[in-house]
């Protein structure tokens, strides 16, 4: 699964998942914690992260939503996603 970004100990990844049941989303990992966020709108759809890390991921995703959606489309068409800048 390609790593799109990494910041503050959080790793952002995205799977290539095809089919109408798979809404655009990404996975955020921190240690043993994992959360899945939808892209439109940016919202937690599964799992959990500690509150501070969840806020960081949500802020980052809001800033990078168009890039995340573009990477989702790249993956679904069989193309490698592009890296996305982390939070400063």
Where are these regions (language model features)?
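Basic nucleic-acid-binding interfaces
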Residues: 1-88
């Amino acid at each position: 699964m390609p790593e799109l970004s990494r910041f503050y100990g959080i790793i952002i990844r995205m799977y290539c998942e095809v089919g109408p049941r798979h809404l655009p989303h990404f996975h955020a990992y921190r240690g043993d914690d994992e959360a899945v966020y939808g892209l439109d709108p940016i919202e937690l759809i599964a799992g959990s992260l500690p509150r501070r890390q969840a806020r960081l991921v949500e802020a980052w995703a809001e800033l990078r939503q168009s890039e995340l959606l573009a990477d989702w489309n790249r993956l679904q068409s069989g193309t490698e996603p592009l890296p996305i800048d982390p939070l400063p």
